[in-house]
Design a protein with these regions (language model features):
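Short glycine-rich substrate-engagement loop in P-loop NTPases that contacts/grips substrate
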Residues: 1-7, 45-80, 91
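The conserved phosphate-sensing helix
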Residues: 176-186
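Conserved AAA+ ATPase "sensor/coupling" helix adjacent to the nucleotide-binding pocket
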Residues: 127, 143-158
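Conserved AAA+ ATPase "SRH/arginine-finger" region at the nucleotide-binding site
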Residues: 51-53, 129-143
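Structural recognition of the conserved hydrophobic beta-strand(s) that form the central parallel beta-sheet
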Residues: 50, 82, 107-113
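Walker A/P-loop
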Residues: 12-50, 65-68, 98-103
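Loop/turn-to-beta-strand initiation segments
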Residues: 20, 76-80, 103-109, 130
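Short regulatory helix/loop adjacent to the ATP-binding pocket of P-loop NTPases
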Residues: 98-101, 115-129, 146
Length: 186
């Protein structure tokens, strides 16, 4: 992303383990969830990942209770909470996060495909440190992702001795419409 370059405030906050709450917004397949997972890994905190379309207030409150025990207990440790599709929660559901954010119990990233200025409560927006916009990936970006997947022996297809034509990768990248998931799933 345009905010992810060496020495940026974004990268320094992750490196220094000071990354606070944020909203990620942009089209599907642009890396919002992947980046949230990488940040959580770097922050070395308990991590909960939920999807707003399948998780209700009851489950959220259970997570926040566990987080409070960690934060107010002996460990004094924050919990990292990632909520995918955050815009799918209504005002009441979004508001159920407020107290935990105010108390500093959780570090929170909400991701959304909707403009957060219209889909996220003002009370939540005022408590997150930053809002980051993700753009559709370029054809070149998608080709790099495809190459990485085809070449990576540990987490990709590198052990399968696959042969591909460069033109085919570019065509696939063009057809994906800037969505890495579509390119990888095709």
């Amino acid at each position: 992303g345009h905010f992810m370059y060496d020495g940026s405030l974004f990268c320094n906050a992750i490196k220094n383990k000071t990354f606070e709450s944020a909203i990620f917004f942009g089209p599907s397949g642009t890396g919002k969830t992947t980046l949230a997972r990488l940040i959580a890994q770097e922050m070395d905190l308990d991590f909960f990942e939920i999807n707003a379309s399948t998780t209700g207030i009851k489950e959220l409150k259970e997570i926040l209770e566990k987080a409070k025990v960690k934060f107010f207990g002996l460990q004094k440790q924050k919990t990292y909470l990632y909520v995918d599709e955050f815009h799918k929660w209504n005002k009441l559901q979004q508001d159920s996060l407020l107290k935990a954010l105010e108390e500093g119990v959780v570090r929170f990233i909400g991701s959304t495909t909707e403009n957060p200025y219209f889909s996220v409560n003002n009370a939540i927006l005022s408590r997150v440190r930053s809002i980051y916009e993700f753009k559709k990936l370029s054809t070149d970006d998608i080709v790099k992702i495809l190459h990485n997947t085809l070449d990576n022996k540990e987490r990709g297809l590198g052990n399968h001795s696959l042969v591909w034509q460069e033109e085919a990768l570019h065509a696939l990248a063009d057809l994906s419409g800037g969505d890495a998931r579509i390119a990888l799933d095709t």
